[in-house]
């Protein structure tokens, strides 16, 4: 049984040019596991705390030297000599050492980087692919599936400098037979969308997650452009390819109103639920994330009652990968799916617990990146190892996004005939 002999933290950069935390976990047999913590732009108020320095003279206050010092000091001292394969014990020890509800003392970014690095070191020590080790930790050994990618090809909201209010417009290749076929379909649509936008005289620069970020007349206009690109790529919208939205509604919710400034419209909760319902009737939208504000549980209930039987309603800012909040949502019949982001909760163990709780309640779990990413591709292994069935990791450009897709291609190749891709069966309705 290998032991942890050293842990090193360092400050590295994410895809937005902001500092983030990387950790190495070194074992007594020479194995090293490394992992980076991602960072979000539109964040839920109840997320675990990302510890930043606040020193305006360095990186405009966004440095992470405090988190790095916590890795190189108290976390290292705590975990030296421990078994890297005992993930639960490592994570619980760090959570206990932190002692706060939201990991404010050590920083969720510090704890998460070490948690994931330990898992990677353990997988190498056990001579297992990371996804197989994660499946074992999840209590589902050998139960894998390739996720349907939700590819964010038009960016708005906090992820782009344009007038589009909804944050993400995604395509899902639900009619593909394999993950690699689905990825190819999405890529072809992405390139056709560029041509569609160019033909309209629109900007084809990309946003934080690699999707195009033009100014458009309305959210419906964005959906129309994607529909045209799907058709030009030779696919049938609604059969081969479906659509998904991430409204990130908390970003345009104020004083009980949902304000679509790009369209000059304002709604109460019921009105905005009706607006979204209307979009699902005009386009084959089968998934909507954060359709209402994270605090508007009454509004969420209205939306769930209106379209929850047919549409996947994903809680991101709503549930923040937190089992306490998810449990309450399940009991109240709020939404029917959870977005899974490691750094919202801050450890691999707690992430797996959220996925398990969701699945036990009949909720789906969508594995997700953050808008501030690195080359770390752990979420690809998480999606396969938990058989989550869906992954959100951005568009088809920018290496911080494509690194996850490329890892999924490698895993599909490794799994061979066991690389199950369920397509439309992963969704409601």
From Swiss-Prot:
Record InterPro entries: Enolase (IPR000941), Enolase-like_C_sf (IPR036849), Enolase-like_N (IPR029017), Enolase_C (IPR020810), Enolase_CS (IPR020809), Enolase_N (IPR020811)
EC numbers for this chain: 4.2.1.11
Residues annotated as catalytic: 209 (proton donor), 341 (proton acceptor)
GO molecular function: magnesium ion binding; phosphopyruvate hydratase activity
Subcellular location, record wording: Cytoplasm; Secreted; Cell surface
The entry's keywords: Cytoplasm, Glycolysis, Lyase, Magnesium, Metal-binding, Secreted
A single cellular component GO annotation: extracellular region
Record-linked Pfam families: Enolase_C (PF00113), Enolase_N (PF03952)
Signal peptide: none
UniProt KW Secreted keyword: yes
Catalytic activity: (2R)-2-phosphoglycerate = phosphoenolpyruvate + H2O
Gene Ontology biological process terms in this record: glycolytic process
Complexes and interactors: Component of the RNA degradosome, a multiprotein complex involved in RNA processing and mRNA degradation.
Protein name, entry field: Enolase
Gene behind this protein: eno
